[in-house]
């Protein structure tokens, strides 16, 4: 075994006691001389004798000679100055030691004096809405490009899905719409989800097939002209009818041109200084969290005072073992901004965060117009994927058909009795203008007049401004199942779309409570091994493009149904997940031009019917000129945070230099102007604590610098290899939040490419599983009544109609002010009161006329406020055609108008 260590010397032992003295023996006989025996034991020591007399002093000795003096030694040669030593090589990483005792929380630093608040800048004037540009001329169709070469044969595709179900049965007749269900309870507001990454935009779909022109309606039979009756006594003016139901909101108009960007406002004053918060506990480093959405930039905090410098440490000892990380502490409140620390070395590039979870899908977009159901195409076999051809030219729109013949007027009612004309009166003098009369009370509403004949369809009005987004309507009865189309192939990933417009900067938040002074972190590893660059994954092959089935013939036009009553809006269903983008369809064939029908003869002018009830609100007229820009409204609510931006390429890490010796405390010089805000660096790993320096003198606060112009984002580069981990630097001051950039102009739409070559037919795909039916929509609130329509052109003067029934006498109105004296009329003969005629029957409804040509395109509306960075959803699929509603009931007759001023008396 190993040699032991020699122990210390023990203490000496105690002395033994002397033995007793022996007695003298008797003298023996002298014997022969024997052999010398062993020495006996020592005898008893004798007692001291008496002292003798002192002797004589000795003689003085001779003094010896003096020795020679030694020579002085030579001084030693001074040694050379030693060479200054270099920093030693980093020691081997020590084993992790036991967790240290938790230290006392550090004392919070002194609150710095709040800086002087800057003057509030004058807000810039709002930008004006730009005038809409002129509509561009229709471009000519491009030539069809050559067909590209066939691509290489791809690998075998994945296994197919389960088989397709059998064909659907015959489509049954459309049922009558059921009664509207009761309004469901209002759902609770859900938790806003985390915005997911923006998916790649899908391929733009080709233009749909132009529908065939409908057949012209059968002209109605012209009725026999009635005998004109006598002019009846005008009845009381009916009261104004109730406001009709709001019309269907039109499709949104084209987006207006972008307005000029407003002037940048001055930065606001800093918020008040908050109290210092408690010191947070030192926590362990948790796992890398998932990348969250980028929050709004908070306001800069108030600059705090410089902390008390620590004592000058001695020589640096050996690096101890790294302690175990503590538990993750609760995040502290944002602290007051401290003084600018000493610049540190650039930190190493951290790993990229995990991709955030897929956010909750956005609200479904407005359903597009219902297109005609195409005939089911024959499924083809799955072929080898061919190369993706360029996009085809859009098909031309077919010519609009001519308007059909308007229906003939119905038969006139029986004529009324002829009244006897009275004698004509003499003309009176012109009266002077009287004062305005007091309006009389409304009389009893008269009987509703007969419904007027339906006029010919008017021309389509100009596209009105975009109306408010309507609430979701109730779920209608399920329509007939259409023929199942062949499965589409997955399209190639489209190119990235242009960047969305920048959102409106949010309001400036209040300064947060400053956090306490945190504990000193553990010493990190100074240098780590660089990670290896991952191998790039194999690129996926583009899927083959399926063959489009032939377009089915358009079905015959069904009978025109009567409009139904407006149903209540059901509760909003859950947001569905965005489906995959469908493959672009083939452009449809150009429809044949319809033949112009024969022009019918003008029918005889019928008698004038009684005054009808107030009709429904007319279509929205063309939008008026853009009004002057109003005052700025209140700031809008902060939108959902946009998707997290992609991490840019990390810069190369610099070589870490050796730490220098601590410098002496120098005097702080004159503070220079504040520079432009630099880019925010990535946080480095926690490095070893450096030697504390001497505290410098606190200087005066500098003037705040102007914020730099925000730069445009550069293209994403290739992620470089991780750099060498450097000594982390101290955290610098938080920069002033940058001003949001102006909204960029939308880029021009690219020219559509020629259609690609048709690939081989694919195999029959397996049908997908039918999705679960969605929940019924939430009942919405009744919309506000729409604006009154523009006055239509005056109709032709009809013949005198039969006298209507005598109205009920209204209540006597209050006497009005004296009206202006009227022009004396010719004295008429007193006629006898006519007998009320029999009300005529309603004429048959005329055949619906053909759709007129489209009206001119209205001017572009003003551009709305830019939203936050939203996600562009996939284009929604065309929904099934809804059942035409039944015709609305006739509105009540309006109350009679106020009586007119009395005329002047005739001459006697």
UniProtKB/Swiss-Prot annotation:
<comment type="similarity">
    <text>Belongs to the fibrillar collagen family.</text>
</comment>
<feature type="compositionally biased region" description="Low complexity">
    <location>
        <begin position="569"/>
        <end position="589"/>
    </location>
</feature>
<dbReference type="GO" id="GO:0030198">
    <property type="term" value="P:extracellular matrix organization"/>
</dbReference>
<keyword id="KW-0677">Repeat</keyword>
<keyword id="KW-0176">Collagen</keyword>
<feature type="compositionally biased region" description="Basic and acidic residues">
    <location>
        <begin position="809"/>
        <end position="820"/>
    </location>
</feature>
<feature type="compositionally biased region" description="Low complexity">
    <location>
        <begin position="701"/>
        <end position="730"/>
    </location>
</feature>
<feature type="compositionally biased region" description="Basic and acidic residues">
    <location>
        <begin position="45"/>
        <end position="59"/>
    </location>
</feature>
<keyword id="KW-0272">Extracellular matrix</keyword>
<keyword id="KW-0106">Calcium</keyword>
<comment type="function">
    <text>Type I collagen is a member of group I collagen (fibrillar forming collagen).</text>
</comment>
<feature type="compositionally biased region" description="Gly residues">
    <location>
        <begin position="627"/>
        <end position="636"/>
    </location>
</feature>
<feature type="compositionally biased region" description="Low complexity">
    <location>
        <begin position="465"/>
        <end position="474"/>
    </location>
</feature>
<dbReference type="InterPro" id="IPR008160">
    <property type="entry name" value="Collagen"/>
</dbReference>
<keyword id="KW-0952">Extinct organism protein</keyword>
<feature type="compositionally biased region" description="Basic and acidic residues">
    <location>
        <begin position="590"/>
        <end position="599"/>
    </location>
</feature>
<feature type="compositionally biased region" description="Low complexity">
    <location>
        <begin position="745"/>
        <end position="775"/>
    </location>
</feature>
<feature type="compositionally biased region" description="Low complexity">
    <location>
        <begin position="129"/>
        <end position="158"/>
    </location>
</feature>
<keyword id="KW-0379">Hydroxylation</keyword>
<feature type="compositionally biased region" description="Low complexity">
    <location>
        <begin position="785"/>
        <end position="805"/>
    </location>
</feature>
<dbReference type="Pfam" id="PF01391">
    <property type="entry name" value="Collagen"/>
</dbReference>
<feature type="region of interest" description="Disordered">
    <location>
        <begin position="227"/>
        <end position="908"/>
    </location>
</feature>
<comment type="subunit">
    <text>Trimers of one alpha 2(I) and two alpha 1(I) chains. Interacts (via C-terminus) with TMEM131 (via PapD-L domain); the interaction is direct and is involved in assembly and TRAPPIII ER-to-Golgi transport complex-dependent secretion of collagen.</text>
</comment>
<dbReference type="GO" id="GO:0005615">
    <property type="term" value="C:extracellular space"/>
</dbReference>
<feature type="compositionally biased region" description="Low complexity">
    <location>
        <begin position="293"/>
        <end position="309"/>
    </location>
</feature>
<feature type="compositionally biased region" description="Low complexity">
    <location>
        <begin position="234"/>
        <end position="249"/>
    </location>
</feature>
<dbReference type="GO" id="GO:0031012">
    <property type="term" value="C:extracellular matrix"/>
</dbReference>
<feature type="compositionally biased region" description="Low complexity">
    <location>
        <begin position="526"/>
        <end position="542"/>
    </location>
</feature>
<keyword id="KW-0964">Secreted</keyword>
<feature type="compositionally biased region" description="Low complexity">
    <location>
        <begin position="1"/>
        <end position="36"/>
    </location>
</feature>
<dbReference type="GO" id="GO:0030020">
    <property type="term" value="F:extracellular matrix structural constituent conferring tensile strength"/>
</dbReference>
<dbReference type="InterPro" id="IPR050149">
    <property type="entry name" value="Collagen_superfamily"/>
</dbReference>
<feature type="compositionally biased region" description="Low complexity">
    <location>
        <begin position="637"/>
        <end position="647"/>
    </location>
</feature>
<protein>
    <recommendedName>
        <fullName>Collagen alpha-2(I) chain</fullName>
    </recommendedName>
</protein>
<feature type="compositionally biased region" description="Low complexity">
    <location>
        <begin position="403"/>
        <end position="418"/>
    </location>
</feature>
<feature type="compositionally biased region" description="Low complexity">
    <location>
        <begin position="602"/>
        <end position="617"/>
    </location>
</feature>
<feature type="compositionally biased region" description="Pro residues">
    <location>
        <begin position="893"/>
        <end position="908"/>
    </location>
</feature>
<dbReference type="GO" id="GO:0005581">
    <property type="term" value="C:collagen trimer"/>
</dbReference>
<feature type="region of interest" description="Disordered">
    <location>
        <begin position="1"/>
        <end position="211"/>
    </location>
</feature>
<feature type="compositionally biased region" description="Low complexity">
    <location>
        <begin position="183"/>
        <end position="197"/>
    </location>
</feature>
């Amino acid at each position: 075994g190993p040699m032991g260590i020699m122990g210390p010397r023990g203490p000496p032992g105690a002395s033994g006691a002397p033995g007793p003295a022996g007695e003298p023996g008797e003298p023996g006989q002298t014997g022969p001389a024997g052999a010398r025996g062993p020495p006996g034991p020592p005898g008893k020591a004798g007692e001291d004798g008496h002292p003798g007399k002192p002797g004589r002093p000795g003689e003085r000795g001779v003094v010896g000679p003096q020795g020679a003096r030694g020579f002085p030694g030579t001084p030693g040669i001074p040694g050379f100055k030693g060479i200054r030593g270099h920093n030693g090589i980093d020691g081997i990483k020590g084993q992790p030691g036991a967790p240290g005792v938790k230290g006392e929380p550090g004392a919070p630093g002194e609150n710095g004096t709040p800086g002087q608040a800057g003057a509030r800048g004058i807000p810039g004037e709002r930008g004006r809405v730009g005038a809409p540009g002129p509509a561009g001329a229709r471009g000519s169709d491009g030539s069809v490009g050559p067909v590209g070469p066939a691509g290489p044969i791809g690998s075998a595709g994945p296994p197919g899905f389960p088989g397709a179900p059998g064909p659907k049965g015959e489509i049954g007749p459309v049922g009558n719409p059921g009664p509207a269900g009761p309004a469901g309870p209002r759902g609770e507001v859900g938790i806003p989800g985390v915005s997911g990454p923006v998916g790649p935009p899908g391929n733009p779909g080709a233009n749909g097939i132009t529908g065939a022109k409908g057949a012209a309606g059968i002209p109605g039979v012209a009725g026999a002209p009635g005998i004109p009756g006598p002019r009846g006594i005008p009845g009381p003016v009916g009261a104004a009818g109730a406001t009709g139901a709001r019309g269907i909101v039109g499709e949104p108009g084209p987006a207006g041109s972008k307005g000029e960007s407003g002037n940048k406002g001055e930065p606001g004053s800093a918020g008040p200084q908050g109290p210092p918060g408690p010191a947070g506990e030192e926590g362990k480093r948790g796992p890398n969290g998932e990348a969250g959405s980028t929050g709004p930039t908070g306001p800069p905090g108030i600059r705090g005072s410089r902390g008390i410098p620590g004592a000058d440490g001695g020589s640096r000892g050996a690096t101890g073992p790294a302690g175990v990380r503590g538990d993750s502490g609760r995040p502290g409140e944002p602290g007051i901004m401290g003084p600018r620390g000493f610049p540190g070395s650039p930190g190493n590039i951290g790993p990229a965060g995990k991709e955030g979870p897929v956010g909750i899908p956005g609200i479904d977009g407005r359903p597009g117009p219902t297109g005609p159901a195409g005939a089911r195409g024959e499924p083809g076999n799955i072929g080898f994927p061919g190369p993706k051809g360029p996009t085809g030219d859009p098909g031309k729109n077919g010519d609009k058909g001519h308007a059909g013949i308007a229906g003939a007027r119905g038969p006139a009612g029986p004529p009324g009795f002829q009244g006897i004309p009275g004698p004509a009166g003499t003309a009176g003098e012109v009266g002077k203008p009287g004062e305005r009369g007091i309006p009389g009370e409304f009389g009893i509403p008269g009987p509703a007049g007969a419904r007027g004949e339906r006029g010919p369809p008017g021309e389509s009005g100009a596209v009105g401004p975009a109306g408010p987004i309507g609430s979701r309507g109730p779920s209608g009865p399920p329509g007939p199942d259409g023929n199942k189309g062949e499965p589409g192939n997955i399209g190639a990933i489209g190119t990235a779309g242009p960047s969305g417009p920048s959102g409106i900067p949010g309001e400036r938040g209040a300064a947060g409570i400053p956090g306490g002074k945190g504990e000193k972190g553990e010493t990190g590893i100074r240098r780590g091994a660089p990670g290896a660059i991952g191998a790039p994954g194999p690129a996926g092959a583009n899927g083959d493009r399926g063959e489009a089935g032939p377009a089915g013939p358009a079905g015959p036009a069904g009978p025109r149904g009567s409009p139904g009553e407006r149903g209540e809006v059901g509760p909003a269903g859950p947001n569905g997940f965005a489906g995959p983008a469908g493959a672009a369809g083939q452009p449809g064939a150009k429809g044949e031009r319809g033949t112009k029908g024969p022009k019918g003869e003008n029918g005889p002018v019928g008698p004038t019917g009684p005054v009808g009830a107030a009709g429904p609100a007319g279509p929205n007229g063309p939008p008026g000129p853009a009004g002057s820009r109003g005052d700025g409204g209140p700031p809008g609510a902060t939108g959902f945070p946009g998707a997290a931006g992609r991490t840019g390429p990390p810069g190369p890490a610099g070589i870490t230099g050796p730490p220098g010796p601590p410098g002496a405390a120098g005097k702080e010089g004159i503070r220079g102007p504040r520079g432009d805000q630099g880019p925010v660096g990535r946080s480095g790993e926690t490095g070893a604590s450096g030697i504390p320096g001497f505290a410098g003198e606190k200087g005066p606060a500098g003037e705040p610098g102007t914020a730099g112009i925000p730069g445009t984002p550069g293209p994403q580069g290739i992620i470089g290899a991780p750099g060498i981990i450097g000594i982390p630097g101290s955290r610098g001051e938080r920069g002033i939040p940058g001003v949001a950039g102006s909204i960029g102009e939308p880029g021009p739409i690219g020219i559509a490419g020629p259609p690609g070559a048709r690939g081989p037919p694919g195999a029959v795909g397996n049908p997908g599983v039918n999705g679960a039916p969605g929940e019924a929509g939430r009942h919405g609130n009744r919309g506000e009544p729409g604006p009154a329509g523009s006055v239509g052109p005056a109709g032709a003067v009809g013949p005198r109609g039969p006298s209507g029934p005598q109205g009920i006498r209204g209540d006597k109105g209050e006497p009005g002010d004296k009206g202006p004296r009227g022009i004396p009329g010719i004295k008429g003969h007193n006629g006898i009161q006519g007998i009320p005629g029999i009300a005529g029957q309603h004429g048959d409804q005329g055949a619906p006329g053909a759709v007129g040509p489209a009206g001119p395109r209205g001017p572009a509306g003003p551009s709305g406020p830019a939203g936050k960075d939203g996600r562009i959803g996939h284009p929604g699929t065309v929904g099934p055609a809804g059942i035409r509603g039944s015709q609305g009931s006739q509105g009540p007759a309006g109350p009679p108008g106020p009586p007119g001023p009395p005329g002047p008396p005739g001459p006697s």
